[in-house]
Amino acid sequence: KQAFISGMSGVVTDIKNLAMAEMPIYVVVAAVLSLLILLLTMDSLVTPFIFLLGIGMAIVYNMGTNMVFGEISYITQALTAILQLGVTMDYSIFLLESYEANKVRYDGDKNRAMAHAISNTFTSVTSSSVTTIAGFAALCFMTFKLGMDLGLVMAKGVIIGVIVCLTVLPALILCFDKAIDKTTHKNLIPNLDGLSKKIVKGWPVVLVLFLVLLGPAMYGNSNYEIYYDIAGALPQSLDSAVANKKLEEKFNMNSTHIVLMKNGMTSKEKSERKLRM
């Protein structure tokens, strides 16, 4: 290559290109891992796909409504799908479990069971979603604009996730109800009643154990390093990393400094100012 671009401009450009290129990959990986976990923990082969379909729609709605902000950071764009998938999955599980319980209670009346399930789910997820929204909204008070950017997008994403869970997902469950029943199988997770009884019976031991572990946890919290070198965290094969390395090797410098001087200074004054730096 004839030329290289170093400094923050090159680093920021490489971070943006890397994040946008890898975003589809880790979104697919997250979806596959979520699907595998749901297949292991749910008692129907169809429900995991319904959950991911509903959450996928909520993510698309959230991404689409970002146009109201005019623009968002590429970092927010890269993180939103994964975060929304993680924080809103529980709402779908609440709805399905409530629906299954009410279906038994109302002797197979699916519409009535789903109506009560929606009501029960709304009550259950209200406090959970409100605290989640408040947590993301707190980011808006950061001076760093990225905090407001990420906070607003994710708070909106949680709201949309709740709305989809209470509107679109019930329709999907009712639509595929027969398929859900036909693919129902024995739960692959072993019964934990025995462990639950032991924990309840031996709660003083559990409490003491966690109090003992609190000390090492507090020590660890105060004794790990935080790195601030963004460029050093990037793959060394990126153009900006290659440029910075060549800058250091050929010119014995790895950072650029800009000196601002008053207009009209004489050469002597400039030399004296340089010596004082």
Predicted segments, located by residue:
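Juxtamembrane segments of multi-pass membrane proteins
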Residues: 196-198, 204-277
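Surface-exposed amphipathic alpha-helical segments in non-transmembrane regions
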Residues: 1-2, 277
